[in-house]
Amino acid sequence: MNNLTGQRWILLRGLARESRHWGAFIVQLQAIFPEDEINLLDLPGTGRFYQEPSPNNIQAICHQLRAQALDKGYLDQPVNILALSLGAMVAWEWMQCYPEDIATATLMNTSFSNLSPFYQRLRWQSYQQFLSLAVTRNIKQKEAKILQLTSNSRADDQCILLEWETIQSEQPISFKNSLQQICAAATYKPCKSKPPCPVLLLNSLQDRLVSPLCSMAIQKQWQLELRSHPSAGHDLTLDAGDWVVRQLKDWLV
């Protein structure tokens, strides 16, 4: 690809997560693209907007996020968008509805309901762990379960756990908003037209939450570039942030 350094980025997290969950990855990304402007957006019902209701469909989430980006002045030039899981569904909708906004899109560990069956979009092996989150009220226990489910290499990292516990204590995502996001993800069926901008897919072959076959299905449908990490979990930037930024540099520069 052409050299796209000096550009602006928008980053989107996934289900029931907020922008602070990017953690140290932001430092890693900035180190690789030192001249770039990196901007983080919170999905409705998360982060700074935790007291607001989340829509139950990807289209509405997309429109609210775009309004947020416009308000902050992030869209006066096309952006590189980097998104994980649910956030990647929003990114896909964004580039289809507003192609003038997006220069490139990198989508990590995501899935679409019209391309992959439900038992791949949420791996059946994780059902018990996933359901236990719904009945866990203790914040530390809940965040520990999420970390165990989404990370393969840092599942016992007490520093990460403390950070996540603090985030949830300060800006808790409600059970209702979590359900709304689950509904949005479960029902999302993108249009079948080819993406209007360059797209890179990244997935984790050992993702225990979403099957890597889901990214493969997206790759096959539109003949997109897919790069796979052999051992990381669902939270790819947590487990392999250095690998992610290397792929971005190789692809963009």
Q: How should these model regions be labeled?
A:
Residues 195, 201-203, 207:
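Short beta-strand/loop motif that positions the catalytic acidic residue
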Residues 208-214:
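Conserved alpha/beta-hydrolase "acid-adjacent" motif
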Residues 83-87, 91:
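Gly/Ala-rich beta-loop-alpha elbow adjacent to hydrolase catalytic centers
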Residues 96, 102-134:
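Flexible "cap/lid" loop of the alpha/beta hydrolase fold
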Residues 37-80:
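Active-site loop/oxyanion-hole signature of alpha/beta-hydrolase fold enzymes
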Residues 232-245:
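Catalytic histidine-centered segment of alpha/beta-hydrolase-like enzymes
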Residues 2-51:
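Conserved HGGG/HGGXW glycine-rich cap/lid loop of the alpha/beta-hydrolase fold
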Residues 138-192:
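Conserved alpha/beta-hydrolase catalytic His-Asp/Glu region
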